[in-house]
Amino acid sequence: MQMEHRATRLDLDFNFHVSNRSYVSIALLTMPDEVLAKQTLKTVTVHWLHETYLDETLLCRMSRTEDGSYLHTLTNADGVVVCELMSQWQPQPETPDVSEVLNRSL
């Protein structure tokens, strides 16, 4: 999966670069809905390689690795990799039905 993201003022830090938090948020937007619905983020490893500024466009590509992790690669308009992330996900714990919890406490 891939998507484009144009850096806005909301993405910037105090030095007017795209913030570290924004790179992670942008990358995670490429996660499939079925993963987000049934799993939670376990770990994320980030390698920041180049700075990105206001109005620059990033292309974020996501692919699944052999071990089941997800590789997120963000490149700028020149094709330069600006950030790479590896995310690992785990199944969400079972959430009891609210009515069951309420009945147990009565």
Please place each PLM-identified region on the residue numbering:
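Hot-dog-fold acyl-thioester-processing enzymes
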Residues: M1-T40, E94-L106
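A broad, structure-centric signal for solvent-exposed, well-ordered loop/edge residues
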Residues: F14, S19, S25, Y53-D55, ...
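A conserved acidic, glycine/proline-rich C-terminal tail/linker
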Residues: E34-L71
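HotDog/MaoC-like acyl-thioester-processing domains
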Residues: T52-L54, S63-L106
